[in-house]
Amino acid sequence: MSTINLPLNLTVRVHPVVLFQIVDAYERRNADSERVIGTLLGSVDKGVVEVTNCFCVPHKEHADQVEAELGYASDLYDLNRRVNPSENIVGWWATGQEVTNHSSVIHEYYARECNNPIHLTLDTSLSAARMGIKAYVCVSLGVPGGKTGCMFTPINVEISSYEPEVVGLQLCSKTIGVQQNASRPRTVSPMLDLAQITEASDKLLTLLGEVLNYVEDVLAEKQQPDNSVGRALLDLIHSVPNMTSDQFAQMFNSNVKDLLMVVTLSQLIKTQLQLNEKLTSLTSFIN
């Protein structure tokens, strides 16, 4: 009889910063390295593994063994714990689209560092025209009194983002197609607050138009109604504060005035710092 001692209903949620760090480590790898590995950091709660950070572990793979700088990995983890004490080791990652023969050896080390570690693979070679991401757990198999082994079994993996990460991703998306279009800027900067409000308002108007079109199509029996969408719209309506147009205009104008005041003060501080820098340089030159 075979034995399986690990639940397979886990869900792995990976944050974009983890993917960026893996790609950066792959780009900085040694010329003789075929793949890069590292440690995954995060938390586990009710069957959900939240991967929020990671770091690279230098290693070399030979035909019959794996050499990894475990002392470096331990020191780096201890340093990270001082900054982020809530992040624990939850598994390890590797570049490539497949689980190799050395994966079980590396997994044994992480099994000593945490319970039920996960294994994350990222296809940095873009073999399928996209950066495929997969997650695995190692399932123990064996016969009582006989030989034992393990098998990497795929589990569900999702991309999850905090609100600041979404803002960063939106900025990164503006550089898509730079190589094909030389007229597009190679770098982007965060927009001013007023420009962000304008862009958000335009997006909100577009989304409201889509919602109105959906409601009108349902009322005209051009589209089948969806109960989940109806409940979401009802919750949205209930979340809107009950106020008159004059009250809303007064509140909006007050917030805009506060925003303009903050922008003005920040520009004054920036100008003062630039002036102070020039005066300091001039004083040093005179002396």
UniProtKB/Swiss-Prot annotation:
Keywords: Cytoplasm, Initiation factor, Protein biosynthesis. Residues 12-142 form the MPN domain. InterPro entries: eIF3f, EIF3F/CSN6-like_C, JAMM/MPN+_dom, MPN. It comes from the Eukaryota. Pfam families: JAB, MitMem_reg. It is found in: Cytoplasm. GO terms for molecular function: metallopeptidase activity; translation initiation factor activity; translation initiation factor binding. GO terms for cellular component: eukaryotic 43S preinitiation complex; eukaryotic 48S preinitiation complex; eukaryotic translation initiation factor 3 complex, eIF3m. GO terms for biological process: formation of cytoplasmic translation initiation complex. Component of the eukaryotic translation initiation factor 3 (eIF-3) complex, which is involved in protein synthesis of a specialized repertoire of mRNAs and, together with other initiation factors, stimulates binding of mRNA and methionyl-tRNAi to the 40S ribosome. The eIF-3 complex specifically targets and initiates translation of a subset of mRNAs involved in cell proliferation. Belongs to the eIF-3 subunit F family. Component of the eukaryotic translation initiation factor 3 (eIF-3) complex. This is Eukaryotic translation initiation factor 3 subunit F. It comes from Aedes aegypti (Yellowfever mosquito). The lineage of its organism: Eukaryota, Metazoa, Ecdysozoa, Arthropoda, Hexapoda. The gene is eIF3-S5.
